Amino acid sequence: MITKRIIPCLDVRNGRVVKGTNFEGIKDVADPVEMARRYNAAGADELVVYDITASFEGRALFTEILTKVASEIFIPLTVGGGINTLEDFDRVLKCGADKVSVNSGALKNPNLIPAAAQRYGNQCVVLSADVKRVDGQFRVFAKGGREDTGRDALDWIAWAVDHGAGEVCLNSIDTDGVRNGFDLEMLDAVASRVSVPIIASGGAGKKEDFLELFGHKGIDAGLAAGIFHQKLLTIRELKEYLNKNGVEMRL
């Protein structure tokens, strides 16, 4: 049995970790290096860090922070945000990232996925998809969930995996920050189309949500931010609960 993963996520803007709901209303939470250190010690299986600053100055500051984060943790690190070219892959991998997450950059230039997979290997390329229901269809959104691309999300995700994405991080905009459980309907739809690991993101509110999530076929990891940042649930407590309930975890 493959062990399931618990992954905290840090959204970094102007050098600080921030958190919003349904991709809106961003609030300052903490220092990223301090937080990364805390999650590493708390038993997180991986850490995801997103650069949500679009400016050039912000990017330089983020690169500096990323290098510090990578030197402080001993778990796999996935980095995303502003990844538009192979040079961007180089930049974050040199900082110490293990995997690189592509989103809007790949929607703009789909060839980025096969090019990156060829250069770094599929295991290094994570497709991050921000998905929302529009007129009964799962649509993929760009620009941090602000722009409807009009594309069918399931077709886009399947294409990306066929062309080299080794993992999918599915962010449901509909359940993001709402803490009412993961978007299982959306996750099942994606799992029926791809066979690579899927990370579920958006909606975690309590430990039972993770237990329900891992009862669904094809879901390898649960990603959350708010509930961990605000210490409503510790990773240790969550993993012990899941383990006790028959979910294979690395304790």
For the regions a language model picked out, list residue spans one by one.
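Glycine/small-residue-rich loop that forms an oxyanion/phosphate-binding "nest" at active or ligand-binding sites
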Residues: T53, L61-Y120
